[in-house]
């Protein structure tokens, strides 16, 4: 979940800044073609900037430390396990990091398979058995081997393009009028207000689509973990998370697997644990 939140937050920030620039300067002009070209350029700029900053931002957000030289048995086990799984998945060895947090959490990020990162919290290492942690690591390795971050960036770029394009086409129509001479004029104030409101509304709809795709990716990563270490280990890891959820108040934590059941599934980046376990059992 962390990698998704960071990606979307960065993307939204870039989109907001670029959207204000477009609205204030009127760079795209009034023509549909001009708006479409600018929507493509600015839409993909937000997602690609988010993608290439994802690894650095993720590490900084959790104050993670990349393991360059294992200092203890746990770090050695992590490096050996990730190395073995990466080789089996056919991808280059990613960087491995540990960060201090009581949350049971792990995530993978990075712009390319050759420049990726797998990070694990101390909470996960302290609350899971080696078999369960191995399954979680395999899940993250599967995200990398599936190219999920790149695919997510491309999808977000397309969604951004539609958000920008539709909001500005509608805003242009609403703000445009004809004077007594038959010349078309446009109220910049109305255009700015309408385009910003529509961008926020369409942005919510785009987020629903992005979250649906994220849930689909999680099922694929679970299946990938099952192929790397066996589905029983992955089921055990998810069941462990269920047990922890029952005994700890983890609501609001950035967790790679834990899902807050009070939220609508439409806005979940991960499917409910019950559905994931059921899907694994049906493999």
Swiss-Prot record:
What top-level class of enzyme does the UniProt entry assign? Answer: hydrolase
- Its chief place of residence is membrane
Q: What is its EC number?
A: 3.4.24.-
Q: PROSITE patterns per the record?
A: ZINC_PROTEASE
In terms of InterPro entries, this protein maps to: HtpX_protease, Pept_M48_protease_HtpX, Peptidase_M48
A single GO CC term for this protein reads: plasma membrane
Q: How does it sit in the membrane?
A: Multi-pass membrane protein
The active site of this protein is located at: 140
Question: What does the note accompanying the cofactor annotation read?
Answer: Binds 1 zinc ion per subunit.
Question: Which cofactors does it use?
Answer: Zn(2+)
Name its GO BP terms in alphabetical order.
proteolysis
Q: Membrane-crossing residues?
A: 4-24, 33-53, 147-167, 190-210
Q: Where in the cell is it found?
A: Cell inner membrane
Single Gene Ontology MF annotation = zinc ion binding
Which keywords accompany this UniProt record?
Cell inner membrane, Cell membrane, Hydrolase, Membrane, Metal-binding, Metalloprotease, Protease, Stress response, Transmembrane, Transmembrane helix, Zinc
Q: Which HAMAP family match?
A: Pept_M48_protease_HtpX
What family is this protein classified in? Answer: Belongs to the peptidase M48B family.
- What name goes with this protein? Protease HtpX
UniProt lists the gene as htpX
């Amino acid at each position: 979940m962390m990698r998704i939140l960071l990606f979307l937050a960065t993307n939204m920030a870039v989109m907001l800044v670029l959207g204000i620039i477009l609205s204030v300067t009127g760079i795209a002009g009034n023509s549909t073609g001009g708006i479409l070209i600018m929507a493509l350029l600015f839409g993909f700029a937000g997602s690609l900037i988010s993608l290439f900053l994802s690894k650095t931002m993720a590490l900084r957000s959790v104050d993670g430390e990349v393991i360059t030289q294992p200092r203890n048995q746990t770090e050695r086990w992590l490096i050996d396990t990730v190395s073995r799984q990466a080789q089996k998945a056919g991808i280059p060895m990613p960087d491995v990091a540990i960060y201090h947090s009581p949350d049971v959490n792990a995530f993978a990020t990075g712009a390319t398979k050759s420049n990726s990162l797998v990070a694990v919290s101390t909470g996960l290492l302290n609350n899971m058995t080696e078999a369960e942690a191995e399954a979680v690591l395999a899940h993250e390795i599967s995200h990398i081997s599936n190219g999920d971050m790149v695919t997510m960036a491309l999808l977000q770029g397309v969604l951004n393009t539609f958000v920008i394009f539709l909001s500005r086409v509608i805003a242009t129509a609403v703000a445009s009028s004809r004077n007594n001479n038959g010349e078309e004029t446009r109220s910049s104030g109305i255009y700015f207000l309408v385009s910003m409101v529509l961008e926020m509304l369409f942005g919510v709809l785009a987020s629903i689509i992005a979250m649906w795709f994220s849930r689909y990716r999680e099922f694929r990563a679970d299946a990938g973990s099952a192929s790397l270490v066996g589905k029983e280990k992955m089921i055990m890891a998810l069941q462990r998370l269920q047990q922890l959820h029952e005994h700890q108040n983890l609501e609001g934590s950035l967790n790679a697997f834990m899902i807050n059941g009070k939220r609508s599934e439409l806005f979940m980046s991960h499917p409910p644990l019950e559905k994931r376990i059921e899907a694994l059992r049906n493999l």
